[in-house]
């Protein structure tokens, strides 16, 4: 067989290593480096939309507002306005603009800054007569533009007719021969709102002299002008709305533009108050169309800034209050509100809102920032312009107007008009700066489906129409940009790459929509013409990288060949492979590609070309079989001196049979074609005889030199023997495909009756496993595969028990190295479907092979729990072997074992034999719990344990269980007592005794051990339980002496023991006197033992003082006939021989201290008694006062007359009587039987009812209880 070729770095090699250090063949999955790459970048997707609006516009805005808006400054206007006091408000139209002045006149200019007309606020032609000299607040124009109305800060309103012939007489004739500026007087003056702030002024309908006016008082009125008498124009008014409430104030009103519908013209009035926003229909009659409550956060704050704005077509109205905006959408057909949206709170207060067009809303904030919002997209900010640089007059909302998508600004120095520039202006600005890439990115942003600024930039809102406008300029600009980059000294890779990526994104999305725009592959080919030979490398590198990331899938044949030629000369095989795999092969130069693949041994790529170009999926398999069977001379594809790796055929077959294109790892499409290829290849691989090859010839594809030696299923056996691990890994992966389901209609016929299914392949493998001609390695791997496949696909694979015996015997009898883990996995997966007829022999085989995990499952299934437990105990690393801990396994075994059975006895023997081992591996606490649940008799095994500390810990845990004493041997209890006395500290012993119930015998046993250990405090506890209080007193006194001798001078500990001794003395009954004598005598003699300046002597002194006080207190609780008990005890103490032998001086000082303490205690007692007596006197008086207040009543009815005397249903006149008492006022006397008599027994009656029954005052008795008491009369 020929040698394999060199493994080039560029080849998509497949990792075929299967060994013990890596994956087993059951875990292996075929893959290629290319398939991994495709998985990480599967397909190109368009970049997400920029959240701040189109990227190009956002970039322009970042450079300043001048980038998006062009400004014109009109400076001559202000020189004219100076004579009239300066501007106060503005109203622009298409050909003229009107400016209100601070002296009251309204000036009309054209856009050449010529003053056209002066509107004078007077009804007379003489300007000196009754002219309003007040700043103009607002200006409005009627629908046909013939009449103008203005409101003033004084509350006056004037209307001018621009079509009248007469003018106001000038005060002086011009001397320079120039024509004087015409001046018009007002035709109507409304003074109903004088000294009131006007909050709304609009023309109503198509009328010339009808106005809707609102003011701060809350009134909204309609004024109608009409002529009377000598054609004099007068007006009348009608109130439309009056908001006059302390809780709700009118902020402003705004009339919509004229709405014409079905021969009817009308307006909608929007009204904003501090609590509501409403829409009112004014004709044919006034009616409320919509109302909503202003948000609570706004209601609860002071309204500083507010605004209302209507769109020109009346489809939307927006209003703002402080820093929140709301937009109401209205149906043009029936005026019904369609939706209402509310913005989140803005960071700063909003001065003014005005619609730029029907969709975009302009917002001016308090910091002079102008925002363009899109309310339909959650009030997204599309543009942000800084108007602070323009130095607007204050307040800016009065000097700023948006009309016909233009800005009109009154600044401190001039009048400015701003207009949005067109998209071509912005593009040209980029080009002039040499920023071609920025220009292309700007156009790309305008081609996005979501481009709300398109209309402002003079583009069509419709995406298709906008594409037609932009694609041709974009294409031409792209070519120019590419040419511009190339003309530089060195073509920059990054710039070319960025440019081409923009072109790729745009042309892929938009060029298909327009036949007039060349496709992307044409552009890329044209781009190649711009590069000189020295710069080709940069262009090819950019194109190759764009192809590699999946952005481009097709290029022209010319470019394809050029780029392949270039990288072939560079011998960059990796790029060649990526290009051929990633691009559409229809434009590929097949001859060139095949030659390169054969020259550089790009075997995977050669297979791909053969599949895609020739649509032939069988020839690669045939060639690979020729190579494996040493028939290289017959190869068509791999006919060179080098051969592909031997594992290539397994990866190729795996990909195809699982429906994936090799080596792309992408699904073969369409599905019908994929199914056909899979059927043909599966029929080929699993054919039972040699097939004809070529298929239209009479020649056959033999794997043996001698056709007579050709085996059945030749290709199956060839692949199995060539590399059994990879072949079985291939089968393991392809078995997961639905192709091999028995009920799949797409499976291929073999012969005419058999189908290539999992069952079919398993039958072939069973024959191969039984074939002794195969090596032991092949047979055991096949057996392992069969075992695992049966457990994975039980519904598709059926195998007889005899065949399973053969599988199991093959695995167990194998001597192949390195398959221990996988063999055990195979046997374990087979157990649910296999039952050995000779279980004992099977167990012996498993033991011989150390298949412990399998053996454990066998023991469980056979209920051999003793053997399972022994096996667990023999295993060193249980967690690694069984994937669980020993506690869980042991607990499981003991719970599953039937109580009282023979197996239960065997398990007990195993536990008894390995008791020490179980304690060390499971833990003492867990063992106690598990053994208690299984059998209490197991606890006796602790007696055989040599380590006493282990015994003590075990028994501690055991006897902490409630009611355990009656369930275990008494020897355990005795041992527990002995070990506790031996190993527990004195403090631990005391804690244990306090929490343990002991019998008398156990107490005596413990007492002996405690006395041996001189644990007097614990001994006192035992004596107290035995009611030997005199001995308990001795123990406590010995403990006190022991503490003093050992230097433990904690007074609180000593006093605690002494007080326990007091309690024992008092509990001693008849021995009480002797106990007290013993206690005091002991302390006196102990006092005499210590030197004068010893600390212990002082402690004894304190203890003696406490002892005498305890004795005195004990007297107070004794019987009355034992009044002399104290002196008897003291006499006996002083007569005691040990006291007599003490020094008189020591005894004198001691007794003086005792009596001083006694006197002090007596004085304290007297003071406390006095305090208690004084306090108790107050308490008694308070108690008596409470008693005199009366008693509660059990029932609400009088027991005699049955009427209500308390609670619900009481006569109402009683409340009047109560009021009379409270107010001390005279009242008409009414007999209400109000006095009530309440007895101590809680029964109540009317006083008159008792007297009617012959009871006398002060001698009342309860009629129910027949008892006399001092009743309470209320």
Curated annotation (Swiss-Prot):
Alphabetic keyword roster: Acetylation, Golgi apparatus, Metal-binding, Protein transport, Repeat, Transport, WD repeat, Zinc, Zinc-finger
GO biological process: endosomal vesicle fusion; late endosome to vacuole transport via multivesicular body sorting pathway; protein targeting to vacuole; regulation of vacuole fusion, non-autophagic; vesicle tethering
Top-level taxon of the source organism: Eukaryota
Primary location recorded for the protein, binned into one broad class: Golgi
Gene3D superfamilies: YVTN repeat-like/Quinoprotein amine dehydrogenase (2.130.10.10), Zinc/RING finger domain, C3HC4 (zinc finger) (3.30.40.10)
PANTHER family according to UniProt: VACUOLAR PROTEIN SORTING VPS41 (PTHR12616), VACUOLAR PROTEIN SORTING-ASSOCIATED PROTEIN 8 HOMOLOG (PTHR12616:SF8)
RNA-binding among keywords: no
Keyword GTP-binding among UniProt keywords: no
Functional description taken from the UniProt entry: Required for localization and recycling of the CPY sorting receptor (VPS10) to the late-Golgi compartment. Involved in the retention of proteins to the late-Golgi. Plays an integral role in the complex vacuolar protein sorting process.
Name the record gives this protein: Vacuolar protein sorting-associated protein 8
Organism field: Saccharomyces cerevisiae (strain ATCC 204508 / S288c)
One GO molecular-function entry: GTPase binding
Zinc finger intervals, RING-type: 1198-1266
Family from the record: Belongs to the VPS8 family.
Further comment found in the protein's record: Present with 736 molecules/cell in log phase SD medium.
Residue spans of the WD repeats: 75-119, 131-170, 193-233
This protein's GO CC annotations: CORVET complex; early endosome membrane; Golgi stack; HOPS complex; late endosome; membrane
